């Protein structure tokens, strides 16, 4: 074989091997540089400089709710976990979006690591056969006259970057999504919400509803005006199985006010929307989200596909 700097003739073409090798190396290096600089390639490191700040998108909530009669199958995990009697039920479905408007990411990481550490952040869902995040959001339907509160059927959450949040100046998010994998038993996940992104639970997903006809053991919701109240990262009282992760303060009874996720501001975590529940919504339903079928056989792990 000739030396690297010797000419080689082949079919009338003369090529310097050393130049060919150098050109190939340049192409490889250029490929790595372009991939590293591509806006579609998420950074391998989360942005933890600063503080996260979660809110509830009440504009989206006000535009995506519907009251209707809907068949709920016994095989749906939200039916089992919510204690709902299968069959045709009158429900109100709604969308919840929780943008991170802070200047740092919400970083949760792999559920398997948290379960191994027994830190109380996740619990195992026997129906879904994966882990659910505890205390991510609280769904309440409130009678504004009596103050009575109904709870929703949803039990589990998985935090992902599902939707970019436009900046105030109209620019795109500062970078691509970072958190795109819920994970499962033995399968690593990477959960969280990047700043400039939101985690969205569409109204057609499993558990995104209140049962209105008493089919979940709660009192029947009479026709009238009601408030849907969503609290993201709600406060909780710590227990032996759920220790206090981030302390906000002490209440009047001397109890700790704790949160699962750190934020710069907990006072903006509540969003409310006024809705009207009719007497007979029917299968077509009443509300701004009329016309789209539910996907009760999917939950947030199966059907929340990041953009």
For each predicted feature, which ranges?
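Juxtamembrane cytosolic interface motif at the C-terminal end of transmembrane helices
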Residues: 33-37
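Bacterial N-terminal signal peptides
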Residues: 22-32
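N-terminal Sec-pathway targeting helices
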Residues: 18-20
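Short, Lys/Arg-enriched N-terminal segments with co-localized hydrophobic residues
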Residues: 1-14
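Extracellular/luminal regions of secreted and cell-surface proteins that mediate adhesion/ECM remodeling
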Residues: 38-307
């Amino acid at each position: 074989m000739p030396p690297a700097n010797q000419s080689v003739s082949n079919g009338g073409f003369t090529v310097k091997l050393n130049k060919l090798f150098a050109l190939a190396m340049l192409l490889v290096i250029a490929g790595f540089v372009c991939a590293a600089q591509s806006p579609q390639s998420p950074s391998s490191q989360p942005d933890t400089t600063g503080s996260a700040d979660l809110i509830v998108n009440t504009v989206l909530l006000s535009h995506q709710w519907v009251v209707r009669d809907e068949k709920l199958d016994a095989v749906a995990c939200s039916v089992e976990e919510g204690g709902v009697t299968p069959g045709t039920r009158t429900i109100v479905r709604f969308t919840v979006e929780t943008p991170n408007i802070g200047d740092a990411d919400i970083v949760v990481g792999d559920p398997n690591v948290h379960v191994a550490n027994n830190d109380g952040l996740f619990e195992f869902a026997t129906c879904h056969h994966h882990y659910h995040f505890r205390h991510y959001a609280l769904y309440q339907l409130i009678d504004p006259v009596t103050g009575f509160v109904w709870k929703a059927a949803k039990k589990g959450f998985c935090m992902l970057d599902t939707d970019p949040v436009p900046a105030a100046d109209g620019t795109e998010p500062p970078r691509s999504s970072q958190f795109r994998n819920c994970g499962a038993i033995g399968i690593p996940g990477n959960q969280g919400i990047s700043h400039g992104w939101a985690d969205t639970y569409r109204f057609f997903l499993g558990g995104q509803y209140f049962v209105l006809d008493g089919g979940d053991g709660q009192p029947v919701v009479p026709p009238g005006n009601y408030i849907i109240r969503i609290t993201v990262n709600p406060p909780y009282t710590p227990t032996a199985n759920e220790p206090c992760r981030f302390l906000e303060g002490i209440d009047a009874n001397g109890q700790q006010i704790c949160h699962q996720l750190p934020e710069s501001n907990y006072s903006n975590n509540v969003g409310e929307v006024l809705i009207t529940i009719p007497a007979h919504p029917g299968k077509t339903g009443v509300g701004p989200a009329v016309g789209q079928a539910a996907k009760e056989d999917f939950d947030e792990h199966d059907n929340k596909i990041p953009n």
